[in-house]
């Protein structure tokens, strides 16, 4: 009986990645989230990367709680440049909190978004 209760109490986690389409559950949320982090990221592009002309890409897992608060941010694949990895994590924290879950995400406790972040020439950040 305790195992059943523990299973029932575990958080409902939904994962979105680059392969998720606009028809997938939470696709609208992922798109709004992407726009926000790109806007914040371009406003807060890392000075060290700009000065030293460091470019690259990394994969990041961002986990968001139902209320929009940040649960976790984790580098899954490093860019090989600590300044970029740290900047991506900082940008996620600066952009928080995010919108609370509504609509098709209302029954989800935590949303995991996995994206590739690109720090590009022209000091531009994009993610997909």
Name each region found by the language model.
Residues 1-17, 38-41, 65-77, 86-100, ...:
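Conserved "boundary/linchpin" sites in short secondary-structure elements
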Residues 20-31, 79-83:
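Soluble non-cytosolic domains of exported or imported proteins
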Residues 50-55, 108:
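Short loop/turn motifs at secondary-structure junctions and domain boundaries
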Residues 29, 33, 45, 84-88:
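Stable alpha-helical elements in mature extracytoplasmic
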């Amino acid at each position: 009986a305790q195992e059943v209760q523990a299973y029932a109490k575990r958080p409902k986690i939904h994962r979105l990645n680059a392969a998720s389409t606009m028809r997938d559950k939470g696709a609208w949320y992922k798109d709004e989230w992407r726009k926000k982090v790109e806007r914040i990221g371009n406003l807060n592009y890392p000075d060290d990367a700009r000065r030293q002309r460091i470019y690259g890409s990394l994969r990041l897992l961002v986990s968001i709680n139902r209320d929009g608060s940040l649960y976790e941010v984790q580098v899954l694949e490093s860019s090989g440049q600590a300044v970029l990895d740290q900047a991506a994590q900082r940008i996620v924290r600066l952009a928080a909190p995010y919108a609370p879950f509504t609509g098709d995400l209302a029954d989800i406790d935590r949303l995991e978004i996995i994206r590739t972040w690109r720090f590009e020439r022209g000091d531009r950040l994009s993610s997909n």
